[in-house]
């Protein structure tokens, strides 16, 4: 599995701000979108282009445009919504597929409860976004769902990843690509990433 920890100074700086324990909902939400945007820039750096001729201001001109599969952005509800706008800054015409999965706090197992995928998803590349890759259960379940629908071109974008989640994802889906702003120390006894960001969903939506 291709694993990319984005080490750009802006990514590290913004992620560091997100780790503040008393960060406001507004600021956390803004930074989640900004880091999501920077991860998208990295994840799409290998998209193929083709030369086409357009009518420029002074006559025909040859330019490069993206070719190949169109993109669907797949936020995992609910926290993934916090990164979605940042992703769409770079691919504003992308279609949006939504997957709802929550983690049982006792068993730590993923529980699917909603899905709405775009049509012809088998012809698209999926950018799956979720702030945290902890145990990997929710991400694996989401990718299972996408592959069952025919989508086989998948890139995962997360703010923070635990080594345990990376290992689980690689074992289940070695063909996907992972882009993260940080590979953190690991999980605590409750399945939370250390040092992590806390509960990203609560911080994005202001529910705690």
Curated annotation (Swiss-Prot):
InterPro entries: PRibTrfase_dom (IPR000836), PRTase-like (IPR029057), Upp_B (IPR034332), UPRTase/APRTase (IPR050054), Ura_phspho_trans (IPR005765). NCBIfam families: PRK00129.1 (NF001097), upp (TIGR01091). Keywords: Allosteric enzyme, Glycosyltransferase, GTP-binding, Magnesium, Nucleotide-binding, Transferase. GO terms for biological process: UMP salvage; uracil salvage. Uracil binds at residues 193, 198-200. Binds 1 Mg(2+) ion per subunit. The magnesium is bound as Mg-PRPP. Its cofactor is Mg(2+). Catalyzes the conversion of uracil and 5-phospho-alpha-D-ribose 1-diphosphate (PRPP) to UMP and diphosphate. The lineage of its organism: Bacteria, Pseudomonadati, Pseudomonadota, Gammaproteobacteria, Enterobacterales. The keyword Cell cycle does not apply. It comes from Enterobacter sp. (strain 638). 5-phospho-alpha-D-ribose 1-diphosphate binds at residues 78, 103, 130-138, 199. This is Uracil phosphoribosyltransferase. Belongs to the UPRTase family.
């Amino acid at each position: 599995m291709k694993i990319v920890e984005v080490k750009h100074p802006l990514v590290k700086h913004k992620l560091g701000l997100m780790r503040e324990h008393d960060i406001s909902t507004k600021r956390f939400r803004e930074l989640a979108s900004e880091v999501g945007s920077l991860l998208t820039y990295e994840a799409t750096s290998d998209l193929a282009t083709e030369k086409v001729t357009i009518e420029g201001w002074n006559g025909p001109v040859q330019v490069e445009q993206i070719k190949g599969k169109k993109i669907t952005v797949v936020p995992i509800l609910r926290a993934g919504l916090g990164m979605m706008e940042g992703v769409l800054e770079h691919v504003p015409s992308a279609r949006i597929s939504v997957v709802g999965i929550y983690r049982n706090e006792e068993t730590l197992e993923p529980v699917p409860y909603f899905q709405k995928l775009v049509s012809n998803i088998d012809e698209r590349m999926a950018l799956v976004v979720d702030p945290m890759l902890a145990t990997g259960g929710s991400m694996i379940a989401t990718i299972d769902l996408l592959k069952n629908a025919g989508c086989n071109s998948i890139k995962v974008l997360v703010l923070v990843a635990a080594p345990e989640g990376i290992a689980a994802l690689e074992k289940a889906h070695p063909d996907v690509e992972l882009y993260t702003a940080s590979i953190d120390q690991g999980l605590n006894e409750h399945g939370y990433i250390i040092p992590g960001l806390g509960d990203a969903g609560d911080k994005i939506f202001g529910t705690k």
